[in-house]
Amino acid sequence: WGEAFTYEEIKYEIETKKPAIFAIVHAETSSGVLQPLDGIGDICRKNNCLFLVDAVTSLGALELLIDEWKIDLAYSCSQKGLSCPPGLSPFTMNKRAEEKLSSRKTKVPNWYLDLSLLNKYWGSDRVYHHTAPVNMNFAIREGLRLIANEGLENVWNRHNTNAKKLWNGLESLGMELHVSEDYRLPTLTTVKIPPAVDGDGFRNH
């Protein structure tokens, strides 16, 4: 806990288990780990496996190259890197994932989570699925406008710069950070509780 999976570990698991879909968290909230994703998409393509990424804590704040890294499906939220109120879950899937979805032999048992229905709702069929939260659409538009005005790479750099200042400050106080710098999230910092501090008492307080 507190370490990223290596490329070799992921490659071995995909090649031996042969999953239909490989899912991984890009930015792990509980541990503060940033998982490298480059190269995983190639392994998935070679093994006829879809590549799904949980980008809840990374979208908008960290480099996330959906097409370049050959990510087939990804989802996130509105309230973290996009700086909006909670309530929306941005989602993307490519043609490869759509083809897999449309070739299902069994019906999705859950109506609300049936992506084929969502596809028809957002696509040209316009089949009703749910009432969209219009106020949230305005909110996410504003969040995206602010990111676009600053520049996406500038946002990434700002998070990195501020994180390093925080890390240096914590270490100057004698605190030990939980994750090695190579795999440390710039958007979420985890700190080890010093031996002299009662961890349970601190959390309860």
Language model regions located:
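Conserved PLP-binding catalytic core of the aspartate aminotransferase-like
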Residues: 176-205
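Active-site C-terminal subdomain of aminotransferase-like
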Residues: 79-168, 172
